[in-house]
Amino acid sequence: MFRRKRTYNWTMVDIHNHMLFGVDDGAKTLEMSLQMLKMAFESGTQKVVLTPHYSPRRGKAPYKLILRNYEILKERVAQEIPGLSLYLGREVYYLSNVFEDIDKVEDSDVDMTDYEWGTMNDVKNDFREKDLKAIRMCGTKNMIIEFSAMTDIDTIRRGISDCFMSGFQPIVAHVERYVCIVKDPLLIADLREMGAYIQINADSIMGVNGPQVKKCVKKLLSEEFVDFVASDAHNLTSRKPILSEARDYVSKKYGEIYAQNIFRNNAIKLLVLEK
């Protein structure tokens, strides 16, 4: 029996993705960025916070380069996808000295000559910032932080504590990737009590990352431990910038009010985005 696809009168916000070109292991070119953003927009995402990696393995592009590419992309988006709004953040990979590393170097030290992500130049230039504003979400105190998949819960707690001590509100990225959380999803309750916000990936809701991860995600959703669902998009194929399928699933299984909160409202409130 044919069933008409449900329509929604609210759009979504993607707070974690790698759609900014030429700065990490996500979009490679300006045209690829535009294709990804068009795909996101056509599937119901109206606001996108671009979050390039700050990671030893996945990219530490100089902030000047990130800003330059961001402004180039914004100009093209205004011309080609006028209903889409772009914002800028950063996804920070937690290491014990990460905040000292960011704080101790000057942006003026950066030499972007022949910069190319994935080269030794990337490692040598590192992340040169005069202060910590460069990794804030849309200029707020919020910051996305990620950990190694094998990180133990004590390290995650320490990372959250370090964020607060450095003046940030942590948003823990894709918590369903961490083995300790997959084994015991209720550990998230402790992280939330510390004040951390919790983000999961849309494809994990749909089972793309395996049955154990999906089981973990279902537990987190049933307990309403999730604050944000994001795409964590890196490309147009295996890691697409599409939230709509996960939104449909969550709306049906856990209610549209909760879905609207974790796909839109929480991001609007937290990041002080225009409604």
Show where each model-derived region lies.
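Non-catalytic positions within long, well-ordered alpha-helices that form the structural scaffold/packing
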Residues: 41, 164, 221-222
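Extended substrate/RNA-proximal surfaces in nucleic-acid metabolism proteins
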Residues: 60-199
